[in-house]
Each structure stands twice: as structure tokens, then as C-alpha cells.
Amino acid sequence: MQKVCWPYFDPDFDNLGERIYGPPCRVYIDNDSIQDCTVVKVNSENKQGLLLEVVQILTDMNLIITKSYISSDGGWFMDVFHVKDEHGNKLTDKSVINHIKHAIGTSRRESDFIKASEANNNSLEPQLADHGEHTAIEMTGTDRPGLFSEIFAAFADLHCNVMEAHAWSHNARLACIAYVSDDNTHTPIDDPSRLASIEDHLSTVIRATADPASNSTHVGHKENETDGFLAGQGKGCMNSNMERRLHQLMLSVRDFDEPFCEPSSLSLLSSKLEYCDHKERKTTIVSIGNCEERGYSIVTVKSKDRRRLMFDTICTLVDMQYVIFHAALRSDGADAFQEYFIRHIDGRALNTEGEKERVIKCLEAAIERRVCEGVKLELCAENRVGLLSDITRVLRENGLTVVRADVETQGQKSLNAFYVRDISGNKIDMEFVESVKKEMRPIHLEVKNEDTKIDTVGSDEPTASASATPQRQPQPHRFSLGDILRSQMERLSLNFVPTK
């Protein structure tokens, strides 16, 4: 028998540097220095994208970042975050503190592998967790009233069960990510011919009334294009990765540009009216200057404070291929001020007015696209094929358009959150909204008003006060959502279950 020899590698060799010089990433949690918040300090070897990874971890834990200082110039990375839990208190739970330390340390050790994978794929897509039971489908296009309903109806016609879906609309553009399975076998859809059929069907729906003068709708397979219809098996996600992908999709359809000025249909006109109404109340101000001495561009952002604000800003800069060297954030609970010292990934500052204008518009869009102004409807139902199609069709037929959707399946239940507005662009009369709960009994329906209060750090889902008198607005059409859903009782009543 021939002997086979190979070199021996000590398994501790990879950790030799850490044993000599200490761990490459140190995380400190300080609960003593400041009375009303916890200080999280991160010291690490500097790697491109590490700041985003740390912010993603804090974001996924629903922590509120009230102040932050970042410095990563040279070979070392130093971050300080002042954070509170979702209730506005200091972090006292030892398991939460240990999870932060472990998650950031693990993220740092895996950073080199992730960056190598991204380099090999030549892609900035977030690394998503594997969901072996679902097929991910991504869609982008020109938004119009009723499009969400048409998309969900198409899934029902294609015998696809929607297990999870998230959709944003902004400036008459739409981005949607859906995780589906075959409604008969409950397995991922991996047949190329069937995926092609799904692509063709959904492409037809999305492009049905798209203005030919608009370039905001693109259709193509994932391996060929960066936007349009994208399909792939086994793509799941954590919360912030899903949101980062939605940011990327909205950026790909240029939602930072104004909608087409001369819409050829009433549906596009209503989107334009919504956009104009939003622009009148815009509170985000972005400016860019240059630091000639150090070769930085200085980006300042003033806006209303809310949760995930820092994440939205940083992931947009990273996806636009800018490197953040220094940064500072502070907030007073109502307003937030952010400052970033950046260069392009090739080492240059923002020298042209055109590039500065594009960064300004993209950051404004990234901050504003998450803020939905409308009425939020929360429903919990027994999951079945066609449920989302039925719900969104009822809303569409009665003059409500969905501007954002979050759908999740937990066991046999489907948890649905729809942000809706009047199709004509007017505010929905809150008197009818307040009467919905009484009319819907025993069916449970949560109604939250997003018009009167922005999503601040004090409340992730702001609601209208029950004692507050809603501002009266002239309405061309008055209706009752309770009556609408009651008319569909034969089909829907057996599927709704209480959320509590």
C-alpha cells in the first residue's frame, strides 16, 4: 500500500495573532457612565462595511440609537453608540448584553469570508439566510393604485402560496420581495419552466399600464440584471437584510427622481398628487461640503428622528460605494442630526455638483421612503392561498390604495399589516376608522393612524389617540370599512382569528 503524506497544519495557527495581540474586535458595554442610556463601544481592526454590520446588529435588536461617534480612519475602527431598548430604558438584561457582544464579535470574525463572497459574486446584495422551504421573488416597477392587489391575485392564479412579503412604494415606484411555495406540495418552486411562467405573468401585471416614456420598470432574471423580476430558491432574510434589499431595489428604479410630470392616466396622477402632498411636508435636509485639507466630503443630514434612521442612511451610502471614515449622530427625540465624512471607494471626494446632487437625492429618498403616511390595518388570519388577494381586492374596490405591506406567516396564521390611503390622495376620515373596531366585532382588526404622527424613536408604530378629535377634512366619498368587510363575510369570516 502506497503511503500518502500531506503537510500538517496546527488548528490553532489561525488564532495565533489573536493569542499574541489580543482579539481583533473588542466590545464594551457601559451602564454606569450615563444615567439614562447604555454605552456600547466597539474597537476593531478596520474593514470596509464593518460599520454597517454593527448598525445592522443593533437595529435587528430594536435598539434606539440616540447618539453615536464613529472613527475608522487608518487601520483601526472605533465606535461609540448611546442606545436604549424599545421602551426607552437602559439595557439591563444580561442576555441582551451578552448577545450584543457575541453578535458583533461573530460578525467581525465572519467579515473576511463575507467580503470574499461578495467580491467573488461582484455584488453588493446583503448576505441572506437560507430558507429552504421558500422561493424568493423580487419585483420592481412603476407603482399605481391597485398594483399590490393585482400582484397578490397573480400569485393566487399561479398556485403560489405567499409565506412572507414586504413591499414599499415611494415616488410612484414599487419594490416588493415575496417568499412563496407551491400551494399543493408546500415546497420551493425550482422548475425553470414554471419560474419562467411566473416571471412572464408577473411582468405582464407590473407593466400593464406602465407609461412608455418612463424608464422605471425593468424585467429580467437575477443573473442578468440588477432590477426587475428576480427569482431564486432558498433566499431568506433577517429583518435588516430584507430592508437593505428593499432600499437597493428602490434605488435601482430611481425612486429618488420625481414621477413622470405628464401622467397619461388617472392612476399615475393620483400617485403624483401623493408625491406633491408629501413634498410639501418634507422635513429632510441634506447638504454636502468638502474638507480640502483631508480630502473628505462632509455629508450633513437633518431630519425628524425615528427608529432605523442611522441604518437607512449608512446602508444607502455603502450601497452607493462610499466609505465612511468619521461620523456623528445626535438626536433629541424629535429631530436628528447626522454628519458623515466620506470618500468614494476609489479614494476620491465628491467633486462634481452632479454627483453631490445625486447623493443628496438618494439620501432624502432613503429616509423618506420608510415613513408611510396613511392608515395602518393589522389583520391576523388563518393562512390560505388567495387570502392576500381577497383582502387587497376589497380595499382596492372601495377606494383604498396600499402604499406599504408587511406579511408574515407564523404557523398556520398569516399576520398582515397594510398601510392604506385614499385613492384620490385625500386623507381617510378618521371617524370611520374609529368605528371599524365596533363594526368588525367579533373579528379583530387593529387600525392605526400614521398621518398624525411620524415614526419617532418613542414609538415604533404610532397610533392616533382615542381621545383626540381628528381634524375634519372634506371627503368626496364616505364609507365604512366594517361594512365593506362584512359584505365579504362568507369568504373571509372563517379565516380571521384574534391577534391576542
From Swiss-Prot:
Bias-annotated ranges (Polar residues): 462-474
SUPFAM superfamilies, per database record: ACT-like
Cited InterPro entries: ACR1-12, ACR2/9/10_N, ACT-like_dom_sf, ACT_dom
Disordered: annotated segments: 450-478
Protein origin, superkingdom: Eukaryota
Pfam families assigned to the protein according to its UniProt record, in alphabetical order: ACR10_N (PF24914), ACT (PF01842), ACT_6 (PF13740)
Gene3D superfamilies (UniProt xref): 3.30.70.260
Chain ranges of the ACT domain: 39-121, 136-213, 298-373, 376-459
Keywords associated with the record: Repeat
The keyword Transmembrane is annotated on this UniProt entry: no
Function summary: May bind amino acids.
PANTHER family on file: ACT DOMAIN-CONTAINING PROTEIN ACR2, ACT DOMAIN-CONTAINING PROTEIN ACR4-RELATED
Protein name listed in UniProt: ACT domain-containing protein ACR2
